[in-house]
């Protein structure tokens, strides 16, 4: 590590500048400027436990977007640009969703970004467009 840092506006501190962190900070900017997600409705590096009893494991979601309750509404999984966004990456986000129970998931490596939305039947499908914040927090489900 070179010792370089980047400002994380969500954690309000400098963090080590890694390739994944660069993608995370870029996507925070995209969500704020293009998707109109208020900064105070996002958190980065959100820790949670998954599993029952003594087999619980600690996990961290890269970014979680919250609705106005505040309850989780979207998970974002960020990868380095050289990581292919394959089924394993989406499976990781879906595992996180087993705990956080969101309607929207995004995965990005800074070069490609995929969004999926949960339909009325509970199945996640590719989103036909990038949702803005009001769509993300909407309680209405779509097929």
Residues of each region from the PLM?
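A short, conserved, highly charged catalytic patch centered on acidic carboxylates
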Residues: 1-104, 111-143
